[in-house]
Amino acid sequence: MSDVTTAEFNEDGKYIRKIRSFVLREGRLTKGQSQAIEAHWPAMGLDYTPQALELTQVFGRDADTVLEIGFGMGASLVQMAKAAPEQNFIGIEVHKPGIGTCLSEAGAAEVTNLRVYHHDAMEVLEHSIVDGSLERVQLFFPDPWHKKRHHKRRIVQAEFVQLIRRKLKIGGVFHMATDWENYSEHMLEIMNAAEGYKNQSTTGTVVERPEHRPLTKFEARGHRLGHGVWDIMFERTA
């Protein structure tokens, strides 16, 4: 049994810490995922501690660092790390099968600039990531909680984006993507009201998908069916 902290917010966007316990059963993992964790966790896994992470020690170099919150199965994160060997990448994911698949693909791709946490992103950000240390924070396709009464559960809230701002360097970018138009509107509303940020869109709305974000199979299928995807990028200015 593992205690994992999950994010929840009240109607004013105030972060509420709640502890939810659930069983992380090995039986949920495929044989390949289990083998990948056993083989690659020693080199690529980061065990959560409430102490500040020394990035130069973790990666053995001083380089721009990109952090992704909730990388799912990790395919696009591995692609990004492979395509930008000059950068460091950190992924955070709470679901163990995603960790296993990501490590499997990272091992096959022979990437050396990727590290992953199996922990809640809020705790990692609050306690392990040094303020002003990140070049980019990525939040791709978070749960939209599409029912209005559930909007308070959306991770993008006023307090959350200020936590992200603290962790970004001046000039660093918070990059969000969603395939739910209402959530993109919510993201823009929160970000436009947030101090210390500037929208990178010349129109003050969304941006075209940047080259650094790979086109996923799910997204490509959505495009063929006429479904939209909205990318939002805000730069830390203060």
Swiss-Prot record:
Catalytic activity: guanosine(46) in tRNA + S-adenosyl-L-methionine = N(7)-methylguanosine(46) in tRNA + S-adenosyl-L-homocysteine
GO MF terms, alphabetically ordered: tRNA (guanine(46)-N7)-methyltransferase activity
Annotated pathway: tRNA modification; N(7)-methylguanine-tRNA biosynthesis
Top-level taxon in the UniProt lineage: Bacteria
Pfam families: Methyltransf_4
Main EC class the enzyme belongs to: transferase
Gene3D superfamilies: Vaccinia Virus protein VP39
EC nos: 2.1.1.33
GO CC terms, sorted: tRNA methyltransferase complex
PROSITE patterns: SAM_MT_TRMB
Binding site for S-adenosyl-L-methionine: E68, E93, D120, D143
The entry's keywords: Methyltransferase, S-adenosyl-L-methionine, Transferase, tRNA processing
Catalytic residue positions: D143
Signal sequence, renumbered to the chain: none
List of residues binding substrate: K147, D179, T216, K217, F218, E219
InterPro entries listed in its UniProt record: SAM-dependent_MTases_sf, tRNA_(Gua-N-7)_MeTrfase_Trmb, tRNA_methyltr_TrmB_bact
Stated family: Belongs to the class I-like SAM-binding methyltransferase superfamily. TrmB family.
Known function: Catalyzes the formation of N(7)-methylguanine at position 46 (m7G46) in tRNA.
The protein's name in its UniProt record: tRNA (guanine-N(7)-)-methyltransferase
Protein source organism: Shewanella frigidimarina (strain NCIMB 400)
Lineage: Bacteria, Pseudomonadati, Pseudomonadota, Gammaproteobacteria, Alteromonadales
